[in-house]
């Protein structure tokens, strides 16, 4: 067995049945092994698309996603996807070819120090330096990617090592991830919770990554505590939970932001006090003591000092804190905040109102539908107006905010869950970033649906130029967009273009009931903004609702 064949053998041993990639010279031996190696390979049209498809696959399944690329430009094209996976704590293993070992450091054709490049955007990176260490490195790569706080790992394999043959022994390893249960700290936290008059649960993406959604929901059922979610935490709390206040932060609900500003105890669960959540940090939850629960000790006290820091598995910590609470007045106050600041969908004129369209999509989509988004105004509207059922059913780039993420992530999700509906919500700016992945959709006849909100603008940047840069609209106009339906048709994808709100419901039904891939091109008002908004440098109490 040569090194390339061992790579494929190691993938099978890890339970990997699908990988995403793009071949090239330095990775050709691995592709030769994939030819009849028992692992399905999905050919993407760009290595960045392969990395983001691997993220979508990982998010939709909870498994480790795998992407493969050649040396040089193939490897560098993975970098944005790896950075995205790192910031959102997604388990991904990237396998790259490298020039043969004797040529490393000689500026050989398509040689790039991808190990050095990737150090800042991976949890760990390996350069395989001998055939004998390949089994260990492949095993450790998967252990590191999915243990503790998950993240991306890169394995760079010189071509001569891929071709070398030898008797390789399986390597069995597990990363030591035992965390001592913090008994004393848990007891202190229980006492704080029992005394609190206005407790609030702040739920982040770590809950879904820890597969702790059932534990969280049991905790809420027992405590009846008001709760809010970050962008990546959406779906962890059931949308119909009576005391769920919606998303927190810059484009969060007024109810969530106001309640957090009032609370006297904030329990952060798998969350990291990101700047898009907190607004002006020293004014965030000013009256609250903080209990911070997370698997990653590096997040403790990084941005907000915790009165009690609980490091460990959320599946153990949440039940340990669970207790009935007497907080009727606070519960009713939060429910009243939610009712007072609920979304309003009345909108004058015939133009399509994007928030209402997404609400109508939410009402129609199947229960197990996976929604992916790109980045921009449409992303925030999707976060606000779609009822999210589980974290794995809402896949978005929250930490890095990567335009072009939505379509390849939808590809990965659809491959992972072929029997579920997958809808990609995109904007005309983001869509063009990785539009080539329509070729992947066509090649595999993936039945994913695309809702393309087209305002002929880079909408979020334009909104900020309008609000904070004196309406100096610099390079945010996209009036030269292609004919999106004709573009989709060139890839054999059917679609429809709508411009009026009375067309929306029928168009959504047609899209969702279509058998194959479908593009719904939606023209919206170029000046429609995302509200509410916490301005830069402001407190979450100072939300803008409209232009003054």
Curated annotation (Swiss-Prot):
Gene3D superfamilies: 3.40.50.970, TPP-binding domain (3.40.50.1220). GO terms for molecular function: acetolactate synthase activity; flavin adenine dinucleotide binding; magnesium ion binding; thiamine pyrophosphate binding. FAD binds at residues 149, 251-272, 294-313. Inhibited by the herbicides chlorimuron ethyl, chlorsulfuron and imazapyr. CDD domains: TPP_AHAS, TPP_PYR_POX_like. InterPro entries: Acetolactate_synth_lsu, AHAS_TPP, DHS-like_NAD/FAD-binding_dom, THDP-binding, Thiamin_PyroP_enz_cen_dom, Thiamin_PyroP_enz_TPP-bd_dom, TPP-bd_CS, TPP_enz. This is Acetolactate synthase isozyme 2 large subunit. It comes from Escherichia coli (strain K12). The gene is ilvG.
